[in-house]
Amino acid sequence: MKMRARLLIPVVLWLCSVGQLPHTASAAGSEAPTALTYVTFNLFHGGAFSGLGGNAYDLDERLEIVAEELRTLQADIVGLQEASRGRERGDVAARLAARLGFHYVYAPANPRLFASDGLSRAIASLLGFEEGPAILSRFPVVAWHAYELPRCGRLIESRSLLSAMLATPWGPLRAFSAHTSGDPCQTRRVAEIVRAGQGPLPGVLMGDFNAVEESPAIAAFTRDAGLIDAYRTANPGRPGLTVWQRIEEANPTVQRRVDYILVTPGAAVEGRVASSRLVLNTPRSLRDGKTLWPSDHYGVAAEIEVSRVRAAAHVARRPETTAALPQSLVRFR
C-alpha cells in the first residue's frame, strides 16, 4: 500500500501543476468539447492628456465595474484596447489583471507618434501617458510579440498588434489583441500575421477595428482571410452595436459595431463558436447618484470550443516551457 501511495504522488503533483481549468471544461477523458470564454473590451483611456490625472473619467470606478463583470463571466482570456499607463494611474492592464488573478502582457503603441523615436519618447514622457493593446489570461503567457502596423498615410497615429502564446492544458494557444484605425491596409496586415501563426488549436483575434462589418477593413478578415466573426455567427439577425456610449448618460447611445472576436481555425481543432453576446453593456449608479458605464464601448464575449478528441495528439502533456518561463517572456515573430 505504501509503495502504491508513493507512485501516486507524482501524478497528484502533475495534476495540481495544470492549474484551474475553465468553468466549461469537461471531465478528463470525456469526448465533450471544452469551451474557453474570450472577451474583447476597449477600456476608454480618455485621450493623451488624461495621463495628467490619475482617475480621469472615473477610471478607478470603471475598473471595478469591469473586474466584477469579468469575474461573473468567468472569462478565460481577455483582449484589451486602450490599456493605458501613466504616472498617476499606473499600469491599468496590470491593475485589472491583479484584481482577476490573471497573467497579462501589454505593449504600448503611442510612443511611436512620429518618425523620430526620440521626439516620440519625449512627448510621451512629457504627457506621462502611453496606451496600447493588452492580453489578460487565466493561463500562463509563455511568449509574446508586438507588431507595429503600417501607418497607412497617417503621420501621427501609430497602431500595433499584440500576440501572446498561452500554455493551456490542451496545448499552446495563440491569442491576439489589436486596435486599428479602420484602414484596410492595417487589417490586411493583421490578418496576414494571424493566419501565419496557425497552430493545432484555434487562434483568436480580439479587437476594436474602428470599422463596421460591411467595410473593406472587416472584409479583409472575414471574406479575404477566412476568419470567423464570432458574434455574427451566433447572432445572425442582431445589430451588435458597441461604440459611442456616453459614459454618464442614463440610456444607451451606441451607434456602430466596431468591436470583434474573430476566430481562425487550428490545424487540429476547428474552434466552433458555441455562443457570443454583448457584455459590459449596462450602467451602474454610484453613491452620489451619478450614472456610469464601464466604457464608451461595449464588450463582446464568445465561447469558443476546443475539442479534446480532435486535439488529442497535441494535449498529451503540459508544455514544458510553462515551468521554465513563469516570469520571463520571450518575444517571437
PLM regions: where:
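Active-site beta-strand/loop signature of hydrolases that rely on acidic residues for catalysis
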Residues: 36-43, 66-89, 136, 164, ...
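Structured beta-strand-rich core segments of catalytic domains in phosphoester-bond hydrolases
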Residues: 83-172, 277
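Sec-exported extracytoplasmic/periplasmic mature domains
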Residues: 71-75, 97-101, 105, 141, ...
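Solvent-exposed loop/turn segments at secondary-structure junctions
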Residues: 43-46, 83-87, 110-113, 141-142, ...
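N-terminal, active-site-proximal structural segment of metallo-dependent hydrolase catalytic domains
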Residues: 2-8, 14-102, 106-119, 126, ...
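Extracellular/periplasmic catalytic domains that process cell-envelope and extracellular macromolecules
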Residues: 30-33, 72, 96-98, 126-129, ...
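Extracytoplasmic/secreted proteins, especially bacterial periplasmic and envelope-associated proteins
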Residues: 61, 65-68, 91, 95, ...
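Metal-dependent phosphoester-hydrolase catalytic domains
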Residues: 148, 184, 195-203, 211-333
